[in-house]
């Protein structure tokens, strides 16, 4: 099995391990290295969320540091496009969760659809665990202080 990495897992990894003042590139690199035993991918929606962080950075230095982290990450973890098959899975999940009155944010739905389409688990941060657990037939792994 592989793992689809959600933005919340990347944020949690950085908060758990980043030394004050660090750019975080080494932190993400060490953490992603732990996933070497299985394939890991980033959904296109996660890549988009990361790029928003670059574009909304309050200084050019911070924008450059964020872009460097993303570039380092995507050298080791490929981005999976949101193509027709994943879009259909997204629609199935939307319909299911909508009928149950348990919709989750659209980007997180795209992450879940990517994981289900690939037959992968999804790695999330503690902040997003509850709503990912609403998704049927999705193996949710939560990044904690233990790794």
Describe every region a protein language model picked out.
Residues 12-14, 53, 90, 135:
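Residues that scaffold the ATP/ADP-binding catalytic core of kinase and kinase-like folds
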Residues 112, 116-147:
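Acidic, PIN/NYN-like endoribonuclease modules and their adjacent C-terminal/linker elements
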Residues 10, 47-50, 87, 129-132:
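A generic structural signal for short hydrophobic patches within well-formed alpha-helices
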Residues 1-42, 55-71, 147:
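Short, well-structured N-terminal submotif of metal-dependent ribonuclease cores
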Residues 5-6, 43, 104-105, 126, ...:
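Histidine- and aromatic-rich ligand-binding microenvironments
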Residues 58-61, 97-98, 139-143:
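Short, hinge-like loop/turn segments at secondary-structure boundaries
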Residues 52-55, 76-123:
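Active-site neighborhoods of divalent-metal-dependent phosphate/nucleic-acid chemistry enzymes
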């Amino acid at each position: 099995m592989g793992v689809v990495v959600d933005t919340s897992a990347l944020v949690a990894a950085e908060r758990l391990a980043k030394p004050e003042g660090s750019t975080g590139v080494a932190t993400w690199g060490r953490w992603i290295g732990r996933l070497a035993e299985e394939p890991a991918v980033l959904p296109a929606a996660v890549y988009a969320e990361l790029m928003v962080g670059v574009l909304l950075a309050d200084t050019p230095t911070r924008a450059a540091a964020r872009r460097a982290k993303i570039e380092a990450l995507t050298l080791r973890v490929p981005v999976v496009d949101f193509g027709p098959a994943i879009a259909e899975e997204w629609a199935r999940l939307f319909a299911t969760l909508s009928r149950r009155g348990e919709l989750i944010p659209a980007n997180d739905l795209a992450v879940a659809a990517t994981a289900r389409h690939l037959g992968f688990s999804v790695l999330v941060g503690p902040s997003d665990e509850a709503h990912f657990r609403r998704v049927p037939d999705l193996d949710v792994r939560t990044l904690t202080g233990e790794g």
